[in-house]
Amino acid sequence: MMDVNSSGRPDLYGHLRSLILPEVGRRLQDLSPDGGAHSVVSSWMPHLLSGFPEVTASPAPTWDAPPDNVSGCGEQINYGRVEKVVIGSILTLITLLTIAGNCLVVISVCFVKKLRQPSNYLIVSLALADLSVAVAVMPFVSVTDLIGGKWIFGHFFCNVFIAMDVMCCTASIMTLCVISIDRYLGITRPLTYPVRQNGKCMAKMILSVWLLSASITLPPLFGWAQNVNDDKVCLISQDFGYTIYSTAVAFYIPMSVMLFMYYQIYKAARKSAAKHKFSGFPRVQPESVISLNGVVKLQKEVEECANLSRLLKHERKNISIFKREQKAATTLGIIVGAFTVCWLPFFLLSTARPFICGTSCSCIPLWVERTCLWLGYANSLINPFIYAFFNRDLRTTYRSLLQCQYRNINRKLSAAGMHEALKLAERPERSEFVLQNCDHCGKKGHDT
């Protein structure tokens, strides 16, 4: 049987020594029967041994146990002090800004009278979902990332953390979907939908969103698909069926609905833009010019002025509808675009991971997973600022709250609303021209 050295490898050189050296000694004894062979062997032995390289014991490679910086399911990263400071500062800033922005939304809608409208209840639900992500999820992910990806909060809290993460993020995404439907119905059914858009209807929609979000959270807690959880890793279940179900309900279906709603609003805005074209003043009929009686001629002119006045009123109404549709299309387009950019990479990765890595762990590089995850969390940061940018009342309320001017908020909003109404009431130049002509015609008719 071949010898094995201390490193666990076959000792080839030792085996050769055991075969060659006795044979050399026996031949030397045959050549020197007078007993001088022993001295010859002794003198030549060091030279014979020197022809074979010395084998030193080396530690056997550890094939079963990974090194300290790698876990059995996913890698870990050892950051330097500077890297920890930079990463920690960025993650802390994202978390604090998310908390501040969504708190402003909740405070604004709840405490400002003008903003307490049923249509804004969905925005409050969205802000609460994003605020929950910032308070209950982001801090633990930040700590895990700063220590290199190792989960240190225990087995039980791993399940609680995953449940909170999935439910809050899903509620945020599905609320965005419901908001897009609400905006679409408000644009396409301006007469019937506002009547149904009361507080009770909004409460039912919000409750449905959170219950559906919980339906994705509960299966791993009741044994359908177990989360991946050991001493170092906390990962949502990688079961194939659960992965397809959760990603479809939480992202792919809401994204499809949002894209469809945006397309419908965009199409309505294009259709309204095609209709919104001033057709010009109607031509004066020959009988109104060539008339046997001047009174009949003036009467024709007065009727034409009245028709033009009604036409311009209808045009101003079309302008208002057109602007509202354009604003809704722009706002929803930016919301859908930001949502897709933030969450699409994460859900593509989450869907493909079980089919690439199997159901027991993740083989995706840690920095790729964390980058996609925090990109999705960033959607909770930008939502309040998107709505504030396109909503004048929210923007004014934000400014007043940040300046600690709490008592004057309702007064400022009322003044701003009055100013906006006066701007809309101003007539364009063509309207003034027609009214002046109508007044002139009326005076001439009265004089006649």
UniProtKB/Swiss-Prot annotation:
A lipid is attached at residue 404 (S-palmitoyl cysteine). It is found in: Cell membrane. GO terms for biological process: adenylate cyclase-activating serotonin receptor signaling pathway; chemical synaptic transmission; circadian rhythm; smooth muscle contraction; vasoconstriction. Residues 1-86, 144-155, 223-240, 356-366 are extracellular. Its main location: membrane. The keyword Nucleus does not apply. It is a multi-pass membrane protein. Residues 112-121, 182-201, 264-329, 391-448 are cytoplasmic. Gene3D superfamilies: Rhodopsin 7-helix transmembrane proteins. The chain crosses the membrane at residues 87-111, 122-143, 156-181, 202-222, 241-263, 330-355, 367-390. Serotonin binds at residue 165. Glycans are attached at residues 5, 69. Keywords: Cell membrane, Disulfide bond, G-protein coupled receptor, Glycoprotein, Lipoprotein, Membrane, Palmitate, Receptor, Transducer, Transmembrane, Transmembrane helix. GO terms for cellular component: plasma membrane; synapse. The keyword Transmembrane helix applies. It comes from the Eukaryota. Disulfide bonds join 158-234. One of its GO terms (molecular function) is G protein-coupled serotonin receptor activity. Specificity for G(s) G alpha proteins is determined by the length of transmembrane regions 5 and 6 (TM5 and TM6). Belongs to the G-protein coupled receptor 1 family. G-protein coupled receptor for 5-hydroxytryptamine (serotonin), a biogenic hormone that functions as a neurotransmitter, a hormone and a mitogen. Ligand binding causes a conformation change that triggers signaling via guanine nucleotide-binding proteins (G proteins) and modulates the activity of downstream effectors. HTR7 is coupled to G(s) G alpha proteins and mediates activation of adenylate cyclase activity. This is 5-hydroxytryptamine receptor 7. It comes from Mus musculus (Mouse).
